[in-house]
C-alpha cells in the first residue's frame, strides 16, 4: 500500500521541478478537477441493457470475453458504476442508452420516455453526478437491411424518428432534474456491405429524418445533441451513410456538436488533428475516447501516444471548455469495473500531463521560429515527474494511489460480482 508521506515528499520535489519551468502544479490539478468524463454504462453489462437483454447485438458491435460477474439488473449495474466512480478522482457523468430504461412494463424502443429513466435520475442525484444520453439504433428487429433513419421504407424511418424524439425528451429530463447539461449522442449503423448505385438518396433521407427529430427546440442548458460518424462498420464496409464529412457538415449547418470517436477513423489517421480544423466553424465537440487496434475494436483506453496526442491538442488549443469527453470501449476479458477505472484514470493522466507544460512559453518560441527550443523542451517534458503530481491528485480526491485500487476491485468481485453467477446457476 502506498504511504501518504512518501506521496507528499515526491510531490514536493515534482512541484519544484515544474516551477523551474514556470508550471504551477496546483493550478494544473485544479484545472483537471473541472473536467468531467462521461463514463459509459454499457461496459458493465456488455451492452445487453434491460429492455430486451436477450436480443442479439447488432450494428457491427461485438463484445469479446466472458469474465465472471456481469451486471444483469439495474441495481447491479449502478452498484458497479458506484464502485468505479469511487476509484476515479473527481466528479463525473454517466452515459446511458435507450435500452437501459428501467420499467415494469413491456415497452418498445419508440415507447420509452422520461418516466422510464426515473430510476437513473434518482440514482444520479444520490451520486451527485450528471447523465448523458444515446438513442439506441441497433439490436432491434426494426433495423431493416442495415438501415434505420436513412431507410428507403417510410415506416422504418418513422419508427426510428420517434426513438430519436423520445431520447431528446429523456435527455431534457436529465438536464432539468440534475442541473447539468445532458449531451445526447446520435450514431446510426446505416450503410451497405457492397457497392451501392445511389449514394445520394440515403443521405438526403438521413438529413430529412434528423431534421424532423431535431425540429422541437429544447433549452441547451438542459440538453444538446451530438452527431457521430464512422469510416465503416462490420456489414457496411462499402458505404456508411453517416460518414465523417456528412456529420461534420450537418453539425456545422445545424448548430450541433460533432462527435469524434477515436476508433471510427482509418488506423493511420490522427484524430487529434481534427479538433482545430473543426472548432473555428463548429459549436463544439463530443469526444469518444477509445483504443482501436487495427480497426474499431474498442479496447480499454490506456495511457498511450494516441491518447496523449488527443489531450495535448485539447489543452494546448484551449478547447476543453467546448469539448465533452466520453469513454467508449467494452471488454469482457477483464473485470468490467476495472475496465472503467483503467480507462478513466488513463484519460485523466493524459490530461494532467498535457496541462503540466509551459504552453505559453512554447507558443512564444514557436512564433519566434525557435523550433530548437520547442523540440528540446517537449522532449524533456516526457521525463518530468508528472506521476508524482498524479498521485497527489488522487490523494487530494480521496481515491487510491497507484495500483492500490486493485485490492478494492479484488474484494468487490469476490463479495459482490462473482456470487451473481452462482445465483444464476442455482436458479
Curated annotation (Swiss-Prot):
Reaction it catalyzes: L-rhamnopyranose = L-rhamnulose
Biological process (GO), any one: rhamnose catabolic process
Molecular function per GO: L-rhamnose isomerase activity; manganese ion binding
Keywords, in A-Z order: Cytoplasm, Isomerase, Manganese, Metal-binding, Rhamnose metabolism
Cofactor requirements of the protein: Mn(2+)
Subcellular location: Cytoplasm
Principal location class: cytoplasm
Binding site for Mn(2+): 264, 296, 298
Pfam entry (one): RhaA
GO CC annotations on file: cytoplasm
Cofactor mode of binding and number, as noted: Binds 1 Mn(2+) ion per subunit.
Enzyme Commission no: 5.3.1.14
Pathway membership: Carbohydrate degradation; L-rhamnose degradation; glycerone phosphate from L-rhamnose: step 1/3
Keyword Metal-binding: yes
Family: Belongs to the rhamnose isomerase family.
Free-text function comment from the UniProt entry: Catalyzes the interconversion of L-rhamnose and L-rhamnulose.
Name of the protein in question: L-rhamnose isomerase
Organism of this sequence: Lactiplantibacillus plantarum (strain ATCC BAA-793 / NCIMB 8826 / WCFS1)
Amino acid at each position: 500500500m502506498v504511504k501518504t508521506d512518501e506521496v507528499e515528499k515526491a510531490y514536493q520535489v515534482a512541484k519544484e521541478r515544474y516551477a523551474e519551468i514556470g508550471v504551477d502544479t496546483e493550478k494544473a490539478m485544479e484545472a483537471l478537477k473541472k473536467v468531467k468524463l462521461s463514463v459509459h454504462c454499457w461496459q458493465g453489462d456488455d451492452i445487453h441493457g434491460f429492455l430486451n437483454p436477450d436480443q442479439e447485438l447488432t450494428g457491427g458491435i461485438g463484445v469479446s470475453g466472458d469474465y465472471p460477474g456481469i451486471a444483469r439488473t439495474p441495481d447491479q449495474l449502478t452498484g458497479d458504476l458506484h464502485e468505479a466512480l469511487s476509484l476515479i478522482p473527481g466528479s463525473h457523468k454517466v452515459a446511458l442508452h435507450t435500452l437501459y430504461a428501467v420499467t415494469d412494463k413491456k415497452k418498445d424502443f419508440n415507447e420509452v420516455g422520461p418516466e422510464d429513466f426515473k430510476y437513473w435520475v434518482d440514482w444520479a442525484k444520490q451520486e451527485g453526478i450528471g447523465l448523458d444520453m444515446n438513442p439506441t439504433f441497433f439490436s432491434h428487429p426494426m433495423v431493416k437491411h442495415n438501415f434505420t433513419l436513412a431507410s428507403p421504407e417510410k415506416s422504418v424511418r418513422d419508427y426510428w424518428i420517434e426513438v430519436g424524439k423520445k431520447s431528446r425528451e429523456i435527455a431534457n429530463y436529465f438536464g432539468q432534474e440534475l442541473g447539468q447539461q445532458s449531451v445526447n449522442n446520435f450514431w446510426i449503423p446505416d450503410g451497405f456491405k457492397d457497392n451501392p448505385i445511389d449514394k445520394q438518396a440515403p443521405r438526403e433521407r438521413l438529413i430529412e429524418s434528423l431534421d424532423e427529430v431535431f425540429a422541437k427546440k429544447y433549452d441547451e442548458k438542459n440538453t444538446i445533441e451530438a452527431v457521430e460518424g464512422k469510416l465503416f462498420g462490420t456489414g457496411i464496409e462499402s458505404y456508411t451513410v453517416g460518414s465523417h464529412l456528412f456529420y461534420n457538415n450537418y453539425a456545422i449547418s445545424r448548430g450541433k456538436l460533432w462527435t469524434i470517436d477515436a476508433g471510427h477513423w482509418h488506423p493511420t489517421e490522427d484524430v487529434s488533428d481534427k479538433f482545430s480544423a473543426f472548432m473555428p466553424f463548429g459549436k463544439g465537440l463530443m469526444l469518444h475516447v477509445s483504443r482501436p487496434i487495427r480497426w474499431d475494436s474498442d479496447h480499454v483506453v490506456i495511457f498511450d501516444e494516441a491518447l496523449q496526442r488527443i489531450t495535448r491538442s485539447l489543452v494546448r488549443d484551449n478547447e476543453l471548455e467546448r469539448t465533452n469527453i466520453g469513454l467508449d470501449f467494452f471488454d469482457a476479458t477483464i473485470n468490467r469495473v476495472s475496465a472503467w477505472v483503467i480507462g478513466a484514470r488513463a484519460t485523466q493522466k493524459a490530461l494532467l500531463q498535457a496541462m503540466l507544460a509551459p504552453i505559453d512559453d512554447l507558443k512564444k518560441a514557436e512564433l519566434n521560429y525557435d523550433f530548437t527550443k520547442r523540440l528540446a523542451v517537449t522532449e524533456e517534458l516526457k521525463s518530468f515527474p508528472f506521476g508524482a503530481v498524479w498521485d497527489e491528485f488522487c490523494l487530494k480526491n480521496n481515491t487510491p494511489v497507484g495500483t492500490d485500487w486493485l485490492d478494492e476491485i479484488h474484494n468487490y468481485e469476490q463479495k459482490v460480482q462473482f456470487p451473481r453467477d452462482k445465483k444464476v446457476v442455482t436458479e
